[in-house]
């Protein structure tokens, strides 16, 4: 794989770019939608790289990702800290005036922290059968519920859920050889072939 493309993928910059254009494409008719999309993109880069650093510290990365992290640790620290701070500043400046929204934001933050940090035996991502649903819950809030509040935008609620499921199950397929079997992710339970058929059915 090209080194630049590998870096963009593994640092989650590419995911953040795609998320920016997806969000902006959904809500472009609202004047501040690009700012919201930018905030979410900063958050994606920051949180995912904080996850990477935590799992690196705990020795829970696959060997190939661990070796890549060793080589790029300084830049990953930058990507973990600066975008997270930028996302926080944008949120408190523009979007922190609704109490229920703030409560759900705290839920998102705590879920993101304990998604990788273990309490006792499990982190949230390691609870059997639930990994993909924690991720769907966060992305659903960010991509559909918050924009509904902020922009008063009508939402395709069911289609939005099905869309997120169809793009997040492949992440579990990618991790099937790294996730402990006890996690019981969808591909582990039904197999890769049936997982692909489920995605096709949803789409």
Residues covered by each model-derived region:
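Short, Lys/Arg-rich, polar N-terminal cytosolic tail immediately upstream
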Residues: 1-7, 119-122
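The first (N-terminal) embedded transmembrane alpha-helix
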Residues: 6-27, 81-84, 136-142
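Central hydrophobic cores of alpha-helical transmembrane segments in multi-pass inner-membrane proteins
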Residues: 20, 24, 40-54, 86-88, ...
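Short, hydrophobic transmembrane alpha-helix segments
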Residues: 24-35, 92-96, 150
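Membrane-embedded alpha-helical segments that form the functional core of polytopic membrane enzymes
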Residues: 30-50, 104-111, 152-170
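Solvent-exposed interhelical
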Residues: 44-83, 165-202
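Intramembrane alpha-helical segments
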Residues: 68-150
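Functional transmembrane core segments of multi-pass inner-membrane proteins
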Residues: 132-176
């Amino acid at each position: 794989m090209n080194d630049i493309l590998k870096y963009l993928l593994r640092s989650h910059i590419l995911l953040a770019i795609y998320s920016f254009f997806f969000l902006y494409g959904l809500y472009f008719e609202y004047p501040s939608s690009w700012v919201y999309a930018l905030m979410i993109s900063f958050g994606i880069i920051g949180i995912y790289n904080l996850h990477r650093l935590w799992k690196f510290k705990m020795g829970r990365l696959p060997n190939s990702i661990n070796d890549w992290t060793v080589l790029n640790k300084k830049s990953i620290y930058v990507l973990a800290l600066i975008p997270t701070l930028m996302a926080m500043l944008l949120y408190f400046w523009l979007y922190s005036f609704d109490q229920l929204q703030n409560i759900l934001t705290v839920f998102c933050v705590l879920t993101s922290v304990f998604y990788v940090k273990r309490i006792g035996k499990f982190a949230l991502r390691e609870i059997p059968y639930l990994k993909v649903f924690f991720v769907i819950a966060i992305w659903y809030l960010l991509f559909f519920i918050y924009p509904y509040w902020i922009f008063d935008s009508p939402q395709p609620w069911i289609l939005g859920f099905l869309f997120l499921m169809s793009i997040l199950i492949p992440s579990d397929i990618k991790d099937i050889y790294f996730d402990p079997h006890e996690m019981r992710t969808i591909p582990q339970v039904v197999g890769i072939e049936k997982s692909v058929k489920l995605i096709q059915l949803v789409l």
